[in-house]
Swiss-Prot record:
Lineage, uppermost ranks: Archaea, Methanobacteriati, Methanobacteriota, Stenosarchaea group, Methanomicrobia
Record keywords: Methanogenesis, One-carbon metabolism, Oxidoreductase
Organism this protein belongs to: Methanosphaerula palustris (strain ATCC BAA-1556 / DSM 19958 / E1-9c)
Lineage: superkingdom: Archaea
Catalytic activity of the protein: 5,10-methylenetetrahydromethanopterin + oxidized coenzyme F420-(gamma-L-Glu)(n) + 2 H(+) = 5,10-methenyl-5,6,7,8-tetrahydromethanopterin + reduced coenzyme F420-(gamma-L-Glu)(n)
Protein's recorded name: F420-dependent methylenetetrahydromethanopterin dehydrogenase
SS bond list: none
Record flagged with keyword Hydrolase: no
UniProt xrefs under SUPFAM superfamilies: F420-dependent methylenetetrahydromethanopterin dehydrogenase (MTD)
Length: 280
């Protein structure tokens, strides 16, 4: 059986850059296929409608709906429409746990969710953010999510859903993830050296704090002379978070202790630790 996994990418967060790649890192899995439909950079109704229509036509076994601020009308409407079409959905979004009404509604719904608390908002001020700065910020953020363990936890949760489909479950019978990706959850089981774990945890906490700084710079400060250094400082925080993630990984390398968990062609996850060894 080949499981069809849809990815509806609405706008952009760093988790969306890697969503389907984490499930098939060498593009050689034979048990599943992915298809992504994207609204591009915006969340306009017509763009979201195009994504939903395309995804319905492909008829995936389940759909991952990735977006910033997953309680906005656009992402909410998209997953509601997909659910009406009989397509189970897993929501991947940034930290919406402070948005009480929308967050409570998501928790009470039948949707799965993975809340990536460190997938922070960018410093989107024209005086500061150009294409190079945007790419640099997202590159640092992807590194933080990868090297702290957050991406592995996300991938593992999605693989659990794929495995259920392979077992014959479908629709409402699927048990979907309900995960808030905290720093403790991200680093759990990822490191043998406690200093590496501490650095990775610090990286995640710093990245998580970036969102609040960028909210201040983008929405709460009106004078350009003041908001430019605020958003610039947030991007410097993300750069340091990425550096801490690198340091954590280098410590694990020095002890020959990097955990690797590749997929086999049939989707089975195997693992190894020492570099010169075969995954089992």
């Amino acid at each position: 059986m080949v499981v069809k996994v849809g990815i509806a990418k609405l706008g952009n967060i760093a988790s969306g850059v890697m969503a389907e790649l984490l499930l098939d890192e060498r593009a050689d899995r034979e048990d599943m296929q992915t298809f992504m439909a994207t609204s591009g950079t915006k969340l306009q109704p017509e763009d979201i409608d195009r994504v939903v229509s395309t995804m319905k036509a492909w008829e995936p076994d389940f759909c991952i709906v990735v977006s910033p601020n997953g309680v906005l009308p656009g992402p909410v409407g998209a997953r509601d429409e997909l659910l009406k079409a009989g397509i189970p959905c897993v929501v991947i979004t940034d930290d919406i746990t402070t948005k009480k009404e929308g967050w409570e509604a998501l928790k009470a719904s039948s949707f799965g969710y993975i809340i990536m608390k460190a997938d922070a908002m960018i410093g989107a001020r024209r005086e500061f953010l150009d294409p190079v700065e945007m790419a640099d910020f997202n590159g640092n953020l992807v590194k933080v999510l990868a090297l702290t363990g957050a991406f592995r936890k996300l991938q593992t949760e999605l693989d659990k859903v794929i495995d259920q489909v392979k077992e014959g479950k479908k629709g409402a019978d699927l048990v979907l993830p309900k995960v808030v990706m905290t720093s403790d959850k991200a680093v759990d089981g990822e490191f043998s050296n406690p200093y590496a774990l501490a650095k990775a945890r610090a990286a995640y906490e710093i990245a998580q704090a970036v969102a609040g700084v960028n909210v201040k710079g983008c929405f709460m400060t009106k004078e350009w002379e003041k908001y430019i250094p605020i958003v610039a400082s947030a991007h410097e925080m993300m750069r340091q978070a990425a550096a801490l993630g690198d340091e954590a990984r280098e410590i694990e390398k020095a002890g020959n202790g990097i955990i690797r968990k590749p997929h086999k062609k049939d989707g089975t996850i195997v693992s190894k630790i020492t570099l010169i060894s075969k995954p089992e």
